[in-house]
Structure formats: structure tokens, C-alpha cells
């Protein structure tokens, strides 16, 4: 039974950092990197005294497999359980998750962790994240509880990294537009103002 349930993750115990490390391997074209928390240390004068450099551990999947998984993850956000992870102008890949908590004594109540793992942009990832809700009060999954948080984080990260949004036609048509104030203007003035605003 354990071997069969392992295929959908119900017998394996992972830490969040292990899950993120695997997610990053998918984002990195299949190369597993040693995880680290501190990027660099600066002294009181603002000089960098220590810089962490990424360390490759090994290749765990092929680049082709990595690309296919990223495409499937994008499909989870575009058409699947991760729709709430969508961010207009950015291609987000994601995977919703529900985990059963392992404990020696839980009584009769099974406890869960819900999650959403995301990468962005999915075609050339710069950011990977894992949003977790431990023992949610509501009977909702990672797509409902965690994906909206991931969308907010992705949007901020993309802005901080100066990654410009690239809107498809549908997204462009749904963008809000600023309309000039036309109240109290004559028809001629209103028309000129509207034309000046490309309306």
C-alpha cells in the first residue's frame, strides 16, 4: 500500500525547504542546487563581507522533462486548480497540494496542510515559492487558500526584479484604462480630449 500511495505523495514526509529545492530543480532546467538562506552579509559600511554562491548538487531530471513539467504547471494556473495564482502579464506555473499531517496521536481528526508551489515566469523562472497553510479552519485546498497569496507575492517580486509584464490580447483588452473627465465639456471639447487620450 505504501508504494502505491507514494505515487501521489501520501507516504513521503518532506520539509518545506526540501519541497522548494525540488521545485527549484524544475525551474533550473533539471539541476538540483544546494539550498541556502543568506545571499550575502554586509558590514556597517555597506560593504559585502561574504557572498553565497549557488552550488550545483547534480542533475535530477533532463532539461526536456523540466520544460514539460513547467508547461504542465502553467496549465494548472491557466486551466486547473491553481487559477487563483494567475497574475496578468506574467506566466505563472503552479501546483496545489494537500498533505496529511503525520503525528503519533491525533485523536479521530485527520489534520491537513494545504499549499501552493509556484514559479514565475514559468518559461524562464526567476522566482520559486511555496505558500503553506497549516491546519486550515476551512475545508479548502491550496488553490483557494494559498494560490491568491502566491499571486500577490509573484506580482511584487516581478516588480522588484524589474520584469515587465507581457500581456496577451485578452489581458490587454481587460486592462483598466484611464478615461479623462468629460463632464461639463462641449461635444467638440469632449471629442478632442478623448482623442488626445487615444480613446
What are the residue ranges of the model-derived segments?
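Extended, non-catalytic substrate-recognition/exosite surfaces adjacent to catalytic cores, especially
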Residues: 66
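Short, conserved, surface-exposed binding loops centered on an aromatic residue
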Residues: 59-60, 193
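Glycine-rich loop/hinge motif
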Residues: 164-199
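A short beta-alpha structural unit
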Residues: 54-58, 175-177
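Active-site beta-strand/loop architecture of penicillin-binding DD-peptidases
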Residues: 1-56, 73-162
Amino acid at each position: 500500500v505504501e508504494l502505491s500511495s507514494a505515487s501521489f505523495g501520501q507516504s513521503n514526509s518532506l520539509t518545506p525547504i526540501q519541497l522548494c529545492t525540488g521545485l527549484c530543480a524544475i525551474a533550473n532546467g533539471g539541476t538540483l542546487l544546494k539550498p541556502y538562506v543568506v545571499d550575502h552579509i554586509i558590514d556597517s559600511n555597506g560593504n559585502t563581507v561574504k557572498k553565497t554562491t549557488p552550488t550545483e548538487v547534480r542533475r535530477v531530471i533532463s532539461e526536456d522533462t523540466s520544460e514539460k513539467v513547467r508547461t504542465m504547471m502553467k496549465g494548472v494556473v491557466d486551466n486547473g486548480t491553481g487559477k487563483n495564482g494567475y497574475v496578468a502579464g506574467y506566466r505563472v506555473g503552479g501546483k496545489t497540494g494537500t498533505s496529511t499531517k503525520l503525528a503519533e496521536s491525533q485523536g479521530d481528526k485527520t489534520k491537513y496542510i494545504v499549499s501552493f508551489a509556484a514559479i514565475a515566469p514559468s518559461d524562464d523562472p526567476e522566482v520559486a515559492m511555496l505558500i503553506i497553510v497549516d491546519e486550515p479552519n476551512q475545508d479548502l485546498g491550496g488553490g483557494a487558500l494559498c494560490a491568491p497569496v502566491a499571486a500577490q507575492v509573484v506580482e511584487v517580486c516581478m516588480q522588484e526584479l524589474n520584469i515587465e509584464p507581457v500581456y496577451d490580447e485578452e489581458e490587454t483588452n481587460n486592462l483598466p484604462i484611464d478615461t479623462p473627465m468629460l463632464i461639463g465639456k462641449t461635444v467638440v471639447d469632449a471629442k478632442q480630449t478623448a482623442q488626445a487620450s487615444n480613446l
